[in-house]
Amino acid sequence: MKLITTLPLLALLSGVAFAQQTTDNSCRPDGLYQTPGINVPYCTVYDATGREIISPDHPRRIIGYFTSWRHGKNGQPAYLASDIPWDKITHINYAFAHVNSANQISVGDVTASNNAATGMEWPGVAGAELDPNLPYRGHFNLLQKYKQQYPHVKTLISVGGWAETGGYFDSNGDRVASGGFYSMTTNSDLSINNQGINTFADSAVAFIRQYGFDGVDIDYEYPTSMNDAGNPDDFALANSLRGGLMRSYIELMKVLRQKLDAAGAADGKHYLLTIASPSSGYLLRGMEAFQVTQYLDYVNIMSYDLHGAWNQFVGHNAALFDTGMDAELAAWNYYNTTQYQNIGYLNTDWACHYFRGTMPAGRINIGIPYYSRGWKDVQGGNNGLWGTAALPNQNACPPGTGGSTVSKCGNGAVGIDNLWHDKNTQGGEMPAGSNPLWHTMNLAEGIVGSYAPVYGLDPANPEHQLTGTYSEHYDATAVAPWLWNAQKKVFLSVETEQSIAAKAQYVIENGIGGVMFWELAGDYGWNAANGEYFIGDTLTTQFYNSFRNASPYGAVKANRTMPTQAADIRLSISDFKLGDQNFPINPKLTLTNHSEGAIPGGASISFDVPTAIPDTISDQSGFGLTVIESGRNASGNNIGGLSSDFHRVRFNLPGYLSVASGESVTVTLNYHLPMPMPSNWILSANGADYAFAQEYPQLPVVAIGSGDGGPGDGDANGESCGGVTATIYPYPQWPQTDWQGLPSHAVGGDHLSYQGSVYKANWWTNSVPGSDGSWSFICNL
């Protein structure tokens, strides 16, 4: 096996890598990429700690999606910019713009009077009077008008979404299968469409300048290698490009970041770049190491749609925690597969810890659904929960569902239980149990809302009638409420003030940046005049009241003291297998030495990975890569949440292997659940610790062997070999004895040496030092 490769000192790595940066870092959030040579005005958005400046009563983000189609011109209730609780929120994502056939950002014909974004007017609607000084009308006019009154609120243009990732709707409402993000980023031979990406990025910059947005939010669903992921209308094109989607997605986000940085420097304001990210471990398995996070101001996790009528497994739409009882995971024998260590991944906490492995908590926002999902004719379960509801005729499954003996298509709730339904290509109702929360509140109270006729509910249709009783239930472990109609056997997964209170507290306690919700118009309030619930701001106000006195969010990636100097070592992760073949996950980690000195044989390299993966990560290259500090829950599962952020991982270069300047070393990794780019890298060599300049560009870069390592703890937890005062026993000379008085084990605090390194026992153990989570690496002898 060839372990060392030689590259020119300034060669670009193949695969994906961070870039070396030399520009001003004032106010830059920890871990955010900065375009080389551009002095980005971060301090217009962030304070000296890298935390976003919003307002004194908004220490956490409250981000609402505002949809273009609730304009009221179709006879259904309008939700306009004047209806937004501007004093309660911090960011508005306008949904959606799309990628047009010329690879440009677009909201359609901006000169048309019926264009909701730029052409519509609402005469006689209080608060919806347009600003006559702006050269456009529509939603964009009102958003700009209210932003002037509430300057703490930022607006972003969201591009894509489920329906418009691979195409767009024309002025007649017909979908144009233009290819959208897929063809804009990826050529048919799987190469990167650089021309398409640059065209789109240039148009995005021009767009936000023209309409006064503060950034771009990419809702690309989904650049994963998993077949048949995303909108079934896009499968034919997307499946043919799966092998190149992630590579081109990374390039898209890098180019957007660079062009937004350049525009920000020219305009004197920092522009935001964000995404709506999938949360399921299934989708993330096909997204490599999610190498786009470095380009994002923050990530909005779509921690909802975790269960729905696309299959028969009746469960929570947006559980906060795993319960060990998820019926979908159980059907695949997931909990009994030892490699996964009982880490359930269909919950918000798992997704949050996934991203925490590569980002500060404050650059993460969790998703909250202001809508329901549900099934009818549910069989079994506890008041429906974890029961099944398969469509009786499996030959009539909606596109993209069914076809599996394990995962059958579901029997989605319809009629009065599906107020906000989508339509299929024939114009028929898509069964999904999709409702705004104000409608589910009315169902729980036995109220037929006065709005029913404008949503097409016919009182003569039995499916549209209010029958049975909707009883409220709550899964305290999952933090998830639901409604159960025993007569109809209808299950609707919802959110209530009880679950919102728990999720708000979770955000506060874990230092998370805030929340994002889909969508503003789904929130509820009591309409006393009509005696019913309707569109309101109850839950949004609840988030505001919960957060207003919260502590600042977490602004640093590392939970340990990092070195105060850096070595110029650059890393990439590449060669992922595609789709279902990507198990176990075995990419190649490449480290390239761009330092002036060689990395000596025997040097230690350590890093953090998230507790969202098992603590069994290893390598296939003979480097002895192992977890030296396990963050695994003592319970052996993640029921009720993961208790730690990181596992600490380490490997040593063999004594004979020195990596000279310009050379690379490659290690093949081995793990079983997806993880993002590892973080908090430390090289320990020649008695000193070094961060990686690629990850910590603000640190002084020194030649390997020339520094003192600063006060960083490396992997020594504050100790060094010279500073260990306890007795160090050579393995297998155990310091503790069994009942016969024979050396047999170590207990917490005992130090043993093995293969040139010192380890400290975390608890009772008789395993090989450094072989599992019972040991903490201290230092190299």
Q: Model features per residue range: what roles?
A:
Residues 20-208, 346, 401-442, 448-458, ...:
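Glycan-recognition patch characteristic of GH18 chitinases/ENGases
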Residues 70-71, 432-552, 574, 587-590, ...:
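Extracellular low-complexity, Gly/Ser/Thr-rich intrinsically disordered linkers
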Residues 104-130, 223-430:
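Substrate-binding surface in catalytic domains of secreted glycosidases
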Residues 186-217, 252-262, 284-298:
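An active-site-proximal structural segment forming one wall of the substrate-binding cleft
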Residues 581-589, 601:
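Short, solvent-exposed loop/turn segments enriched in Ser/Thr/Gly
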Residues 709-781:
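Tryptophan-rich substrate-binding surfaces of secreted polymer-degrading and adhesive proteins
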